[in-house]
């Protein structure tokens, strides 16, 4: 009997620091066990993961260390891949020893040219299909004493969570309570990299993914999985759907990342939001 085709999708951690035991226990050891089991069963299995090399986690680390974002991701991609292989995870052999038709274990990078092509291709298709809407939003903007400045997306701004009042919340989410919100809802905002800088609110245009268009179909899918999903997954999904899905921004005022594949000066200096990527 010919083996089944199995795809194992593993989380992609940011390449902004060394992995720790939590990464191994939480997202690398379980899929590696599954990978070995599927191979032992004679299945054709492909396990895919790699380094998430874009977004503010990378640029903030680069600015803190005084090096370029490329140097950050090159350094930690190599360190983390070598560490996983040293632990005995199956990333050493990209192709299965039985032959390429049996799959293998691919530990890739989001800086890979093929990844960029696919992201921009799918982004453009969604835009043409009418799944994006353009909005003028208000964002925090850092103004320096010499008159220069920049927008403060995601980890570039910290403050007090508007939901649970925890300090140290970021511009896109609060790690304490898990809430997501618009950046300007953050209270007592401070620039992460330049705390003494004056912060003001400025307008900037972004594209938003129309998640609300999928409300009904996702409710139907969630209902069909009640006997399959774990209780925490079911409750979390129900909470999101009960609140009503809202459009989410898929672009950022940031140059490190995959450029927005649209014509016009309005999109110059903007990239695809790393979570959407």
Segment roles from a protein language model:
Residues 70-76, 122-139, 154-170, 195, ...:
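Short, Lys/Arg-enriched charge-dense amphipathic segments
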Residues 74, 109, 113-120, 136, ...:
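Short, amphipathic alpha-helical segments
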């Amino acid at each position: 009997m010919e083996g089944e085709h199995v795809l194992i999708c593993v989380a992609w951690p940011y390449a902004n620091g060394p992995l720790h035991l939590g990464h191994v226990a939480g997202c690398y050891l379980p899929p590696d066990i599954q990978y070995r089991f599927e191979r032992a069963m004679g299945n054709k299995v492909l396990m895919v993961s790699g380094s998430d090399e874009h977004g503010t986690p990378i640029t903030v680390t680069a600015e803190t260390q005084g090096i370029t974002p490329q140097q950050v991701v090159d350094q930690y991609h190599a360190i983390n891949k070598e560490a996983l292989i040293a632990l005995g995870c199956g990333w050493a052999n990209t192709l299965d020893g039985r032959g390429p038709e049996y799959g293998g274990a691919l530990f890739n990078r989001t800086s890979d040219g093929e990844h960029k092509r696919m992201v921009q291709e799918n982004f453009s298709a969604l835009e043409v299909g009418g799944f994006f809407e353009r909005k003028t939003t208000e964002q925090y903007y850092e103004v320096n004493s010499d008159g220069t400045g920049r927008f403060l997306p995601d980890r570039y701004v910290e403050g007090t969570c508007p939901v649970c009042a925890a300090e140290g919340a970021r511009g896109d989410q609060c790690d304490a309570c898990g809430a997501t919100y618009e950046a300007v809802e953050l209270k007592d905002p401070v620039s992460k990299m330049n705390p003494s800088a004056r912060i003001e609110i400025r307008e900037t245009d972004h594209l938003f993914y129309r998640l609300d268009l999928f409300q009904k179909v996702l409710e139907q899918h969630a209902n069909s999985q009640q006997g399959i999903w774990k209780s925490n997954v079911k409750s979390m999904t129900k909470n999101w759907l009960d609140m009503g899905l809202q459009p989410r921004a898929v672009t950022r005022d940031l140059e490190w990342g995959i450029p927005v594949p649209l014509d016009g000066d309005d999109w110059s200096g903007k990239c695809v939001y790393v979570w959407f990527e």
